[in-house]
Amino acid sequence: MTKSELIERIVTHQGQLSAKDVELAIKTMLEQMSQALATGDRIEIRGFGSFSLHYRAPRVGRNPKTGESVRLDGKFVPHFKPGKELRDRVNEPE
């Protein structure tokens, strides 16, 4: 599902909200979440899951075209851990 599809679904289910209001709310939420992660904060949405940063240590990689070894610096990457309610819902038999 894309962001536009999400906006469309919310507008369909919540008739009193305009598409512009929903779009602004989603963009604001995503921006705030991005800023929180960029400053090293953890985000927890109960029943859904949590977002945090995991550190990837420096390592030696390989250029797939040439086979040449390449040094890759350490970096932080976003990580999502689903909550129990989300895991249970995804694994429900249909």
Curated annotation (Swiss-Prot):
GO biological processes: DNA recombination; regulation of DNA-templated transcription; regulation of translation
InterPro entries (UniProt xref): Hist_DNA-bd, Histone-like_DNA-bd_CS, IHF-like_DNA-bd_dom_sf, IHF_beta
Primary role: This protein is one of the two subunits of integration host factor, a specific DNA-binding protein that functions in genetic recombination as well as in transcriptional and translational control.
Gene behind the chain: ihfB
A GO molecular-function descriptor: structural constituent of chromatin
Gene Ontology cellular-component annotations: chromosome; cytosol
Keywords from the UniProt entry: DNA recombination, DNA-binding, Transcription, Transcription regulation, Translation regulation
Quaternary structure and partners: Heterodimer of an alpha and a beta chain.
PROSITE patterns per record: HISTONE_LIKE (PS00045)
SMART domains linked to this entry: BHL
Protein name: Integration host factor subunit beta
Pfam families: Bac_DNA_binding
Protein family: Belongs to the bacterial histone-like protein family.
Lineage: Bacteria, Pseudomonadati, Pseudomonadota, Gammaproteobacteria, Pseudomonadales
